[in-house]
């Protein structure tokens, strides 16, 4: 989740960059959720790809905010008591202008969604369902229970309704709308990287400021 703050700074610093932040379900929906929500709310022109394996795999299998209720791991040996967050619904409801979900075993569709997300002008979010073969092997679950939605929703309400489906797992692009970006409204055509001052100019301004105090 912390990568999202850095990604926003990179994009604002140099709007000519195409910026993609790769995060996990644990950090994006846990300790970094505030960064994710505000990047979506602002409509910063970046792409966030959230790899969702439903577990903290690097620390041997603890549950995350998106793990299903009843998930058993080192931190929840009796099963998690919490209902999981729905990343797609969260992103829709905080204002993300492009929201999609893909599955790592469906490479062709995954690639197509990645491309469309990166071409979208504004904040784009892609949740990638991917099993953790060591601590949360969900291949069978996803192979049997995922389906692709026919087309993106015509409205926010329709997108939210699709994202709320529980008996199956919808894949595809839920939402894709045009809206002014935070970067454009903030920068108004400027590029802070190419228009930055030289080191001597910066030092001169600092010295001038200090002298005036």
Model-derived features with residue positions:
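Active-site glycine- and acidic-residue-rich loops that bind
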Residues: 27-30, 102-111, 154-156
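Conserved thiamine diphosphate
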Residues: 16, 64-117
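Short acidic/glycine-rich loop or secondary-structure boundary segments that cap or lie
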Residues: 57-58, 108-110, 126, 133-138, ...
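Thiamine diphosphate
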Residues: 1-57
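Active-site rim beta-loop-alpha module in soluble metabolic enzymes
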Residues: 94-103, 121, 125-133, 139
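Structural motif
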Residues: 17-21, 45-49, 89, 97-100, ...
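Short acidic, glycine/serine/threonine-rich loops at helix termini
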Residues: 31-35, 41, 58-63, 136-141, ...
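Flexible, low-complexity linker and terminal segments
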Residues: 132-213
């Amino acid at each position: 989740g912390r990568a999202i703050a850095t990604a926003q700074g990179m994009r604002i610093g140099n709007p000519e960059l195409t910026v993609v932040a790769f995060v996990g379900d644990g950090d994006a929906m846990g300790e970094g959720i505030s960064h994710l929500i505000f990047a979506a709310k602002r409509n910063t022109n970046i792409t966030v790809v959230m790899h969702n394996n439903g577990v903290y795999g690097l620390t041997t299998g603890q549950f995350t905010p998106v793990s299903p209720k009843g998930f058993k791991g080192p931190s929840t040996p009796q099963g998690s008591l919490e209902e999981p967050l729905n990343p797609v619904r969260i992103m829709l409801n905080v204002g993300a202008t492009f929201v999609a979900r893909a599955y790592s075993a469906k490479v062709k569709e995954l690639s197509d969604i990645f491309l469309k997300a990166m071409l979208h002008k504004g904040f784009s979010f892609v949740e990638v369902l991917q099993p953790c073969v060591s601590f949360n092997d969900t291949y069978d679950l996803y192979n049997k229970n995922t389906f692709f939605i026919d087309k993106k929703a015509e409205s926010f309400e329709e997108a939210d309704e699709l994202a709320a489906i529980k008996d199956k797992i919808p894949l595809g692009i839920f939402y894709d709308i045009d809206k002014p970006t935070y970067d454009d409204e903030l920068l108004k055509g400027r590029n802070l990287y190419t228009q930055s001052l030289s080191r001597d100019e910066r030092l001169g301004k600092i010295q001038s400021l200090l002298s005036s105090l």
